[in-house]
Amino acid sequence: MNAWNTIYERFNPIAFSLGSIEVHWYGLAYACAIVIAFYMALRMIQKDPKRFPVARKDFESYFLWAELGIVLGARIGYILIYEPNSSYYLTHFWQIFNPFDSHGNFIGIRGMSYHGGLVGFLIASYLYNRKDLKKLLIYLDLIAISLPLGYVFGRIGNFLNQELVGRIVPKDSHLGQMIGIVVDHELRYPSQLIEAFLEGVIVFLMVMWAKKHTKTHGLLIVVYGLGYSLMRFIAEFYREPDSQLGVYFLNLSMGQILSLFMVIVSLGILLYATKNSKKIKEN
């Protein structure tokens, strides 16, 4: 065992406390993710106004819609897909966003689904642009290029919060023995960091490549969707399946199945973009 393997034994997921309210590193990481995504988008608007012909005040309004859609979709998606007591929440809807436990202690809102957040994001984006759908693909492209680096911090937050842990490392995996993290006396892959790299850094590079080589609105969000789906599908082989769900046909996890649906949605957006989007004008 090396020092990295046992890092959780020396790390507190709580960053600090404000009275009875405990502030977790995950919450701080999520806040960083939002800030990074926001300012990354503003930078893209400033640097490439032909691809992103959006006024800052309009983007600020849209960003609020998008973030609200993500949070609502992520939480509701978790309840519908992953929560074993979903029937309780469906009959006590106000409890879905209740940050306090039965004793009145602040515990925050726990349980978010990325794919649920994606659905909420798409719905919010459509509602915001419903009167001018020509701008929809521009906004989606803007989020596609600004989201991945923020996503890195989200997964780092999962790691710091000691959740969404990886699968048990095989004893004959030399690399796994080096990078694994001890969780409940088992050496597991740091799947959160693997996801941060694959679904964040690699997907960001994919979208940046597409930005350089494509001239049609809507293609960046397609590249993001396909790239994320592929990277998530791979990363799931290192992530422990949700205990309440397990695996399905062909030993696929729920994350992998939802990623396949994400491919279908991305191809649908591609079809829409090729039929309805205009070429980006050159200088």
From Swiss-Prot:
Record-linked NCBIfam families: lgt
Protein name per UniProt: Phosphatidylglycerol--prolipoprotein diacylglyceryl transferase
Stretches that traverse the bilayer: 21-41, 62-82, 106-126, 136-156, 190-210, 218-238, 252-272
Broadest EC class assigned to this enzyme: transferase
Any one GO molecular-function label of the UniProt entry: phosphatidylglycerol-prolipoprotein diacylglyceryl transferase activity
EC id: 2.5.1.145
GO cellular component terms attached to this protein's record: plasma membrane
Encoding gene per record: lgt
Intracellular or extracellular location(s): Cell inner membrane
Protein function: Catalyzes the transfer of the diacylglyceryl group from phosphatidylglycerol to the sulfhydryl group of the N-terminal cysteine of a prolipoprotein, the first step in the formation of mature lipoproteins.
